[in-house]
Structures are given as C-alpha cells and as structure tokens.
C-alpha cells in the first residue's frame, strides 16, 4: 500500500481502478489492483542486478503482457533468460537480449516481456563477430480469455471520463495537454523504490566522465509519466493489456519536461 501511494505521489496517476477499492469492486475486482506500470517497475528492478547493473543504456522492449493483476500483499519474483547477443561495430560494447517472466506467490504469471540492453564488453580489443538477434512479434495476440472481471457498468463520474472503445477511431490523435518536469529528487526516490540500482541512474561521479556528463533518468520514469499524462483522453483505459513494443529513443536528464500524445493505431 505504501508503494502504491508513493507511486501516485511520483507520477500523479489518476486512474480510478488503482486509486479506489470502491471503484475496483464495482468493476468486479476483489479490491484495487496495483498500477500495472508500478508492478512492471518493481518486477523489472529484480532483473537489473543480473542484466543491466553496468549497462550503458536500456534500449527497448517487445511482447510485453500483464496476464494477471497484482494486489497489495502479493509476492512477485522474476527470472530472465538470455535469448540473443549482438556485438556493436565499435567492438567496445554489445546488445544483450533477454526474456523476463514475473510470477506471483502462486506461480501465476503477472508480467512477460523481452528487452534489449547495451552493455560494455570485458575485452574491448577483440572483435567476436557475435550477431544473434532474436525476432519479435509485431503485436501481442489478444487472448481468447482475458483474465479480468466481467464489467457490467463503469461509473464515469468516478473514472473521470465518458469515452469508451466505440468512441475511438483508428488514425485519431489525442494530444494530452499536460507537461511534467522530471526532478532529480523524484527520480532518485522512485527508482530506489523500484530497487533498480543501475549505475547510470545513481553514480553522478561516474557519469560526469561520460559524454552525457550527468546521471540518466530511469526510462521507466518516462513510461510512467506518459501513462499518467494520457489520463486526459484515456480516462477509461484502466488496465494495460500489453505493450507491443517500445524504445527509449532519447535519454532524459533531470530538468527535462515530458509531454505525451496518443495515436489510435487500430480498433
């Protein structure tokens, strides 16, 4: 519960499902589940020590799904399997591809995703020629049975929005009006909350000698910020089913301001 409250403090997320037991129960849940992105960060953080502690940057994601909701009191663990390696042309670093699966205390899958991260090479004088790049599905298939309750009605006064599936059109663009500035203090506390100890986010002394010259903000902060901003226009998009693909296209540093828009690709 403490983590859920802090997550709202860090992101300003306003989605009703994760904010109110009353709304969650009306929607068929036993109580409010924790925010899908908070669950992602908490689970993702478990993989950092083994995969990306010394990473140059986390580059992207594919085939991310959230098969089951997570509630306060659940225990989540994660395993990761290396599925590909690609040496960069400079011979000093390479990209590691991993498949990570998070499960709860009942061994029920709560998170499944693939990601790729750029990591320094131990031997930077010898070219290995390793080039084993996995392929990824373009979209995450819609399951025949989706593990969410049957929702009979949604209180639009409580959710804050009146727009539903039928109101969105492929090709439509939603310009969310807000911008949020990323603060060093919020980033530091949030990333520590997620137990993500990647050096690029915390070691300012080390980062001053890099081309960036300062700490990089954890990319998940940007994902959560964009999701929170999307509330204006997507108020009833209460649950994240999947993320087909994603990339950290540019680094973010303290003081940067994040804006977001949404394009409806398909309905």
Annotate each language-model stretch with its function.
Residues 2, 82, 180-181, 186, ...:
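A broadly conserved detector of short glycine/acidic/proline-rich loop/turn motifs that flank catalytic sites
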Residues 2-59, 121-140, 145-243:
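Hot-dog-fold acyl-thioester-processing enzymes
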Residues 7, 61, 76-80, 96, ...:
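Short, structured motif recognition centered on aromatic/hydrophobic residues
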Residues 43-44, 64, 72:
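Long, hydrophobic/aromatic-enriched structural stretches that serve as scaffold segments
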Residues 54-56, 70, 90-92, 236-238, ...:
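Generic marker of residues within folded, mature protein domains
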Residues 57-68, 82-84, 239-250, 265:
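A cross-kingdom feature marking solvent-exposed beta-strand/loop segments within repeated
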Residues 68-153, 254, 261-267:
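HotDog/MaoC-like acyl-thioester-processing domains
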């Amino acid at each position: 519960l403490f983590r859920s409250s802090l997550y709202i403090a860090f992101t300003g997320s306003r989605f009703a499902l994760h904010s109110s037991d009353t709304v969650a129960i009306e929607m068929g849940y036993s109580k409010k589940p924790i925010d899908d992105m908070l669950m992602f960060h908490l689970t993702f953080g478990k993989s950092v020590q083994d995969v990306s502690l010394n990473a140059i940057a986390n580059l992207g994601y594919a085939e991310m799904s959230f098969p089951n909701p997570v509630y306060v009191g659940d225990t989540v663990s994660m395993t990761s399997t290396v599925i590909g390696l690609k040496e960069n042309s400079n011979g000093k670093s390479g990209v590691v591809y991993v498949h990570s699966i998070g499960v709860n205390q009942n061994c029920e899958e709560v998170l499944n995703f693939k990601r790729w991260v750029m990591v320094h090479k131990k031997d930077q004088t010898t070219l290995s020629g390793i080039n084993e790049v996995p392929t990824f599905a373009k979209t995450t298939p819609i399951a025949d049975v989706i593990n969410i309750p049957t929702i009979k009605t949604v209180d639009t006064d409580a959710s804050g929005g009146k727009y539903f599936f039928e109101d969105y059109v492929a090709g439509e663009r939603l310009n969310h009006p807000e911008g949020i500035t990323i603060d060093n203090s919020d980033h530091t506390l949030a990333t520590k909350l997620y137990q993500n100890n990647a050096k690029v986010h915390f070691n300012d002394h080390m980062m001053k000698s890099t081309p960036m010259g300062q700490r990089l903000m954890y990319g998940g902060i940007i994902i959560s910020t964009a999701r929170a901003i999307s509330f204006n226009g997507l108020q009833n998009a209460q649950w994240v089913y999947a993320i087909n693909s994603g990339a950290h296209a540019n680094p973010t540093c303290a003081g940067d301001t994040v804006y977001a828009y949404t394009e409806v690709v398909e309905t």
